[in-house]
């Protein structure tokens, strides 16, 4: 049985996540999702055309055949025909969450219908995000990426994993101080103490980028991989941080990959691949993510469930892998 397009359209309200590949602009991702939805909605069963009563000729009477009998008949209104009025659905407002630049990849949250309001609520909730960031030692470029114009080449034989982890510990300690400063809580209060002990201290206003946790997942010179949990960041800020880590190690470094593995309650596991950017998959993703977004709509998110553990440099030797959500 064919689905009724208006009924399907009414189900498209909520948040879902897609996986943005590298080298693709976020606007292209959003426009592709919108185009696919419109195409499939217009292919579904539409409302039938309105009917109007017309008096149509039913035959002739009289010897000369000029007298015509007209009978009332219901005929469709031609103005409602798709070839006259065009497709029923021409625009769907698809909103975007925290964006990824063209070189980055990973979790990209989108909203449809009242999901656009949830995007604003999600922004005001100040969720953290997880990234896997890869760097390469021995070179510095103008834009901090391996494709940028090279401005310096250095040696890196003196760098060890222990030296790298000491730098990461300094970064995390410095950012913890910034976190306390921007939390706008009375540092002598019991509330501030409890939040700090539980690792739930967060700035509830817009602040500079803050690194909540950072650790080394892999160290194979000249390449290394970091796991970073942060908030209020940009991808370029993370690339610059790789550059500064290289300088602190008396060398240089460029960023070769920035991949977001979690944005608030949304993880890679619940993100739709490019082959899944269709109506059915998006409907299913919205249903599955509804429970995760209930806390966002209430304005009181369960941070511990949504954000997961904070990585730290001291756990760097425990093993390698993706970010935990």
Curated annotation (Swiss-Prot):
The molecular function GO annotations come to: pseudouridine synthase activity; RNA binding; tRNA pseudouridine(55) synthase activity
Q: Where are the annotated segments for Disordered?
A: 292-325
Q: What is its EC number?
A: 5.4.99.-, 5.4.99.25
- Subcellular location per the Swiss-Prot or TrEMBL entry: Mitochondrion matrix
Q: Which residues form the active site?
A: 101 (nucleophile)
For the keyword Metal-binding, the answer is no
Catalyses which reaction(s): a uridine in mRNA = a pseudouridine in mRNA; uridine(55) in tRNA = pseudouridine(55) in tRNA
- Assigned protein family: Belongs to the pseudouridine synthase TruB family.
Recorded hits in PANTHER family, A to Z, give: PSEUDOURIDINE SYNTHASE-RELATED, PSEUDOURIDYLATE SYNTHASE TRUB2, MITOCHONDRIAL
Function text? Minor enzyme contributing to the isomerization of uridine to pseudouridine (pseudouridylation) of specific mitochondrial mRNAs (mt-mRNAs) such as COXI and COXIII mt-mRNAs, modulating the efficiency of mitochondrial protein synthesis without changes in transcript abundance or stability. Also catalyzes pseudouridylation of some tRNAs, including synthesis of pseudouridine(55) from uracil-55, in the psi GC loop of a subset of tRNAs.
From the Swiss-Prot or TrEMBL record, give the protein name: Pseudouridylate synthase TRUB2, mitochondrial
Organism of origin: Xenopus tropicalis (Western clawed frog)
What is the taxonomic lineage of the source species? Answer: Eukaryota, Metazoa, Chordata, Craniata, Vertebrata
